[in-house]
């Protein structure tokens, strides 16, 4: 942690796949589970750690809500802002939803669609359930690699043997309607694949790959449009773009929700050292933000981190 070798306590799957993490609890038992887990972290001799980092808690997660509103002593726990997740509430019909986009976005999408159809003989879109579609996963990784290979000096963290194996095995554990691949093909060749999960009538845009040879046609944007259509047609209420505030996401939405990490440092030497470095880094970040804000507006911003009780 910050170049200090530490024993870290984290969610299973941390930094592997999930953007939204949380405690798993039976409905109605969320608060009691949170209290029990936090008590065990504080007092159990089995919870030996230097750094506790429960990452990727969105603001409607069970653990975030408990820590943010609890009046009991949450000594040493700190909620640190991590990233924003753009998302859009879907209308009841695709046409109605499209009318909610800006006029410039609708015009750009229509122009790119017409250009693609004029240039190519055959343009086909399709949606495939994640279950039973391993070929679509292969196409996704192939297109993802092709796109990133075209960007010199940049490297994807998704296209690795470990994540390929993880996702391949994951597809065999899913049930029908847990998600879909949205594929756009040109002249019988896939040029864009989107990897979408579904949960409780919410669609989550997890990953994508597209052929850079079709960049001029906005092939990725056109496929997102088709994925949103399919999400609406299958009863989804929201379309979540997950972490990352890339400009293209805000062509389809204006809203976002924040994700946080719960931090706590152990009482040992390494835990105290990691905690000191964490606070110093936070002060430096706030100082840099203050200087930037002073140059821009002349006023000093507040901290985005919420320490529930400092150590």
Where in the sequence are the language-model features?
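Active-site/acyl-donor-binding loops of N-acyltransferases
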Residues: 61-95, 100, 180, 186, ...
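A conserved beta-strand-loop-helix scaffold within acyl/acetyltransferase catalytic domains
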Residues: 1-14, 53-216, 306-311
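Acyl-donor binding region in acyl/amide transferases
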Residues: 1-81, 200-257, 263-264
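Polar/charged alpha-helical tracts
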Residues: 35-39, 148, 172, 289-292
């Amino acid at each position: 942690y910050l170049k200090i070798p530490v024993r870290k306590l984290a969610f299973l799957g941390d930094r592997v796949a999930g953007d939204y993490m949380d405690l798993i609890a039976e409905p109605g038992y969320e608060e009691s589970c949170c209290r029990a887990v936090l008590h065990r972290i504080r007092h159990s001799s089995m919870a030996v750690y230097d750094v506790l980092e429960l990452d990727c808690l969105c603001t409607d997660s069970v653990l975030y809500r408990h820590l943010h509103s609890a009046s009991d002593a949450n000594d040493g726990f700190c909620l640190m802002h991590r990233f924003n997740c753009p998302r859009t509430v879907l209308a009841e019909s695709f046409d109605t939803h499209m009318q909610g986009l800006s006029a410039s976005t609708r015009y750009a999408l229509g122009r790119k669609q017409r250009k693609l159809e004029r240039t190519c003989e055959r343009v086909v879109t399709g949606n495939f359930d994640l279950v039973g579609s391993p070929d679509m996963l292969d196409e996704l990784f192939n297109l993802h690699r092709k796109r990133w290979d075209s960007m010199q000096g940049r490297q994807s963290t998704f296209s690795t043997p470990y994540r390929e194996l993880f996702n391949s095995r994951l597809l065999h554990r899913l049930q029908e309607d847990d998600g879909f691949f949205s594929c756009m093909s040109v002249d019988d060749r896939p040029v864009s694949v989107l990897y979408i999960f579904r949960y409780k009538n919410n669609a989550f845009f997890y990953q994508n790959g597209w052929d850079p040879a079709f960049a001029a046609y906005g092939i990725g944007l056109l496929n997102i449009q088709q994925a949103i259509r399919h999400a609406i047609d299958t009863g989804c209420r929201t379309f979540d773009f997950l972490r990352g505030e890339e400009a293209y996401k805000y062509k389809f939405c204006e809203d976002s929700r924040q994700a946080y990490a719960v931090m706590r440092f152990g009482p040992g030497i390494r835990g105290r050292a990691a905690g000191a470095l964490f606070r110093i880094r936070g002060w430096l970040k706030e100082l840099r933000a203050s200087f930037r804000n002073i140059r821009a507006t002349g006023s000093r911003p507040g901290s985005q981190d919420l320490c529930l009780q400092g150590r």
